[in-house]
């Protein structure tokens, strides 16, 4: 029975000693040197909850992002309107004289003479076989019979005019050329009885047949050269030989 009280007293003594040692140690941390050792630190606890948001700070300066890579070139846009003409530039310096070919060289002269000789031969052949030449006129026929309007058109096509004798020599040349009665470039279509050439000029030479012009049938406004070389008025709608004159 005496053992139990003894143990109780022992435990109470140990608790009291431990408390006393703790207080003494805490006080010793304030007054004792650092060599006095206290109890070891405890284990870190769990993190606490997030605190409340603080007040909004001042606006910061604009930031600068990193410069990206250069992209590929874009498509060409539509062409713009033409700009205004610029002012004339300064006058250039005078150039060196050029070299002109010698137009009067012996070669050019010889070629020109050869061409003139050949043209003269051709005219002689044409005169001998197809036409007649008097002075600076060449009379030519194609041997076809047609109305006066068609004769005019034919001659104009070849840059000629309907044969119109201005004197006895030309009248005779046409007479010797034809084998049929031929139209001449003479009419009184504008004014009855007043015969003129196709340019409207009055005639200075005539060779009318006896009793002509008589305007038989009231529609004889054109003139024929007969086989005997005389003239006779006939209707322009009749068909006769075409003779043209070419200036040479």
Swiss-Prot record:
Calcium-dependent lectin involved in innate immune defense. Binds mannose, fucose and N-acetylglucosamine on different microorganisms and activates the lectin complement pathway. Binds to late apoptotic cells, as well as to apoptotic blebs and to necrotic cells, but not to early apoptotic cells, facilitating their uptake by macrophages. Residues 42-99 form the Collagen-like domain. Hydroxylation on proline residues within the sequence motif, GXPG, is most likely to be 4-hydroxy as this fits the requirement for 4-hydroxylation in vertebrates. It comes from Nomascus concolor (Black crested gibbon). One of its GO terms (cellular component) is multivesicular body. One of its GO terms (biological process) is complement activation, classical pathway. SMART domains: CLECT (SM00034). Keywords: Calcium, Coiled coil, Collagen, Complement activation lectin pathway, Complement pathway, Disulfide bond, Hydroxylation, Immunity, Innate immunity, Lectin, Mannose-binding, Repeat, Secreted, Signal. Residues 1-20 form the signal peptide. This is Mannose-binding protein C. The modification 4-hydroxyproline is found at residues 47, 73, 79, 82, 88. Residues 75-87 have a biased composition (Pro residues). Disulfide bonds join 155-244, 222-236. Residues 49-61 have a biased composition (Basic and acidic residues). The coiled-coil domain mediates trimerization. Its main location: secreted. Residues 112-130 form a coiled coil. Residues 134-245 form the C-type lectin domain. It is found in: Secreted. Oligomeric complex of 3 or more homotrimers. Interacts with MASP1 and MASP2. Interacts with MEP1A and MEP1B and may inhibit their catalytic activity.
């Amino acid at each position: 029975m005496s053992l139990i009280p003894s143990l109780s007293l022992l435990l109470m003594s140990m608790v009291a000693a431990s408390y006393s040692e703790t207080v003494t140690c805490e006080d010793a941390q304030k007054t004792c040197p650092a060599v006095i050792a206290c109890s070891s630190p405890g284990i870190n606890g769990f993190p606490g909850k997030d605190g409340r948001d603080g007040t909004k700070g001042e606006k910061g300066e604009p930031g600068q992002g990193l410069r990206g890579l250069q992209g590929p070139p874009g498509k060409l846009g539509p062409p713009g309107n033409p700009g205004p003409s610029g002012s004339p530039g300064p006058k250039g310096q005078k150039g060196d004289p050029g070299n002109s070919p010698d137009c009067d060289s012996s070669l050019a002269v010889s070629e020109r003479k050869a061409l003139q000789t050949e043209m003269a031969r051709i005219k002689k052949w044409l005169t001998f076989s197809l036409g007649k030449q008097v002075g600076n006129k060449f009379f030519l026929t194609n041997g076809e019979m047609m109305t006066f309007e068609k004769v005019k058109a034919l001659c104009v096509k070849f840059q000629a005019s309907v044969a119109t004798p201005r004197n006895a020599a030309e009248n005779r040349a046409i007479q010797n050329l034809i084998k049929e009665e031929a139209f001449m470039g003479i009419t009184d279509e504008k004014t009855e009885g007043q015969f003129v050439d196709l340019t409207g000029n009055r005639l200075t030479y005539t060779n009318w047949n006896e009793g002509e012009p008589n305007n038989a049938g009231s529609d004889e406004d054109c003139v024929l050269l007969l086989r005997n070389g005389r003239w006779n008025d006939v209707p322009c709608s009749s068909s006769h030989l075409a003779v043209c004159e070419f200036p040479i």
